[in-house]
Amino acid sequence: MNNTIYILGAGSIGSLLAYELASLKSINNRVILLLRDKSRVNSFKDKNSTLKIDRLFEENVPHLCCQVTASEPSQLNVQSIENMIVTTKAGQTENALSKYLPYLSKNSNILFVQNGMGAVENVCGKLWPEEQNKPSIYQGVISHGCFQTAPFHFSHAGLGDLKISKVPKNPKKILPDEAAETPCEMIKSLGKSELLRLRYMNYPELLVNQCEKLVINACINPTTATLDCVNGELYNDESAKELFRCIIKECVDIFFKCIPLFKNNEEAEKILNVNRLLDRVMFVGTKVNGANSSSTRQDCLLLRETEIDAINGYVVKLAENNGFQATVNKTMMLLTKSRLGLNRCRAHAR
């Protein structure tokens, strides 16, 4: 059995997970970063194959460094991949993952840890249309704040947690034996990192937490991107708080109208309460992660495509697919796209 853990996506979250895993004695050198191409691998080697992490929530801590092996599709010399963590942007997942299809089988375990919702269902449906060939799929929801400050150098700005569940074959009809399944060894390895603070849960519980995270992102990401600010600058802003309430109210309304698992679900009603969520956005989003620059803001600053279609755009699409409208979230989505377009025009005009 090959227990190597391959991490597809070397952005802030992928690199944070790679660092935490590679730092475990039980893992040793069994972590491999899967990068885009040879030039990206060579760039990493020029940095001595080292990931650097700064923990902004800890005082007087020097750069944390860890060497990790990197590879890319044409350099991979293995027969199979049994354990993979996917942290690519939602819109890039299908293309990135398809390059590794020859190495993945029904015996593989794949954990998706990404912003937004909807990408996993879409990608798995396209890449594995036949259920019997599909790998075991796990979904992760992470609340750690992390952003890139230089190539392969990241700031861990907010201490959060990592929630994981195995995705059932039919999420709308979960069998009792699926709900009771124990996690695979890859998930257990993540649990050995004290800093990641992993919680393993059943799928309905994770779905509620996934929606909670989506709401936080739907507030913080487009607002910080459009206003070009770090999270903490919104902490005492009453106008931002009023805007967040409008976003949250619409998200919650759409979730309960459109997600069957939330019907008569006391946990969902408790977690996805508008006032509670507003408190969470202000606490987790603007205080705990106050020093963080959201991924969407970073993308806009670096003129890269954002994940806004999988965040506010997911709420818009969920609403429209069920005959409703999500005008507040659509406005935030369009403002973010306009911000990116404006930044690109300004950069081109220089």
Swiss-Prot record:
UniProt: NADP(+) binding residues: 9-14, 115, 307
Gene3D superfamilies: N-(1-d-carboxylethyl)-l-norvaline Dehydrogenase, domain 2, NAD(P)-binding Rossmann-like Domain
Transmembrane segments: none
Gene Ontology, cellular component aspect: cytoplasm; cytosol; mitochondrion; nucleus
EC number(s) from the headed UniProt entry: 1.1.1.169
Enzyme class: oxidoreductase
Keywords linked to the UniProt accession: NADP, Oxidoreductase, Pantothenate biosynthesis
One BP term from GO: pantothenate biosynthetic process
Keyword field contains NADP: yes
Residues that, per the record, bind substrate: 115, 217, 221, 295
SUPFAM superfamilies according to UniProt: 6-phosphogluconate dehydrogenase C-terminal domain-like, NAD(P)-binding Rossmann-fold domains
Reaction equations catalysed: (R)-pantoate + NADP(+) = 2-dehydropantoate + NADPH + H(+)
Active-site residues, record numbering mapped to chain: 213
GO molecular function: 2-dehydropantoate 2-reductase activity; NADP binding
Protein family (similarity comment): Belongs to the ketopantoate reductase family.
Entry function: Catalyzes the NADPH-dependent reduction of ketopantoate into pantoic acid.
The protein's name in its UniProt record: Probable 2-dehydropantoate 2-reductase
